[in-house]
Amino acid sequence: MSDINEIEIPSRKDEIRQVTPKDPMHEIEDKSTYHAKIKKSDSGTVLGAIPLNSRSSSNSSVTSTGQSSRRVTKKTTKKKKKNACYFDTCSSAASKFIGDCNFCKGHFCSKHRLMENHACNGLTSCKEQLHQRNADKLEAEQTKAPKIQI
């Protein structure tokens, strides 16, 4: 072979191989999962499924190494400040000592610290507990001796 552009063509079909490597991400654009072989140290090969979302390509980064391909999706969630009031429209700071709600586990400012003011989910169960406690207290205070008739 003296010319660089000449390529030797094998005579049998079994010897024909594809020379150019395929991009695994390009092949699976329309599939919902991609099975990647991940080799662990001396323990064998593990087959794992990695879900892909072809629509979220603008918010994700793709890294591929050797035998495994991974797709990492960044989640953009809105985090509240640690000491801000948990009420939706309030932006004031939560009270440190009196702002904790035991029923919904929220931290509220002095305006929204009461269960009625922040529309607590545990308001009905709290009312039932207080009603039962008052009934038990009244029953314990009642006199048990029969009344004397004159």
Swiss-Prot record:
Biased composition (Basic residues): 71-82
Chain positions with N-acetylserine modification: S2
Record has Phosphoprotein as a keyword: yes
Chain residues that bind Zn(2+) 1: C85, C90, C109, H112
Record-annotated disulphide pairs: none
Gene Ontology cellular-component annotations: cytoplasm; nucleus
Main location per the UniProt record: nucleus
Keywords carried by this UniProt record: Acetylation, Metal-binding, Nucleus, Phosphoprotein, Stress response, Zinc, Zinc-finger
UniProt xrefs under SMART domains: ZnF_AN1
Biased composition (Basic and acidic residues): 23-33
One BP term from GO: cellular response to arsenic-containing substance
Chain residues that bind Zn(2+) 2: C101, C104, H118, C120
Compositional bias (Low complexity): 53-70
Location of the region described as Disordered in the Swiss-Prot/TrEMBL record: 1-82
InterPro entries: AN1-like_Znf (IPR035896), Znf_AN1 (IPR000058)
ZnF start-end (AN1-type): 79-128
Cell location: Nucleus
Modified residues (Phosphoserine): S43, S54
GO molecular function, one term: zinc ion binding
Other comment: Present with 9520 molecules/cell in log phase SD medium.
Function description: May have a role in protecting cells from metalloid-induced proteotoxicity.
Protein name, per record: AN1-type zinc finger protein TMC1
Annotated source species: Saccharomyces cerevisiae (strain ATCC 204508 / S288c) (Baker's yeast)
Origin organism lineage: Eukaryota, Fungi, Dikarya, Ascomycota, Saccharomycotina
Protein encoded by which gene: TMC1
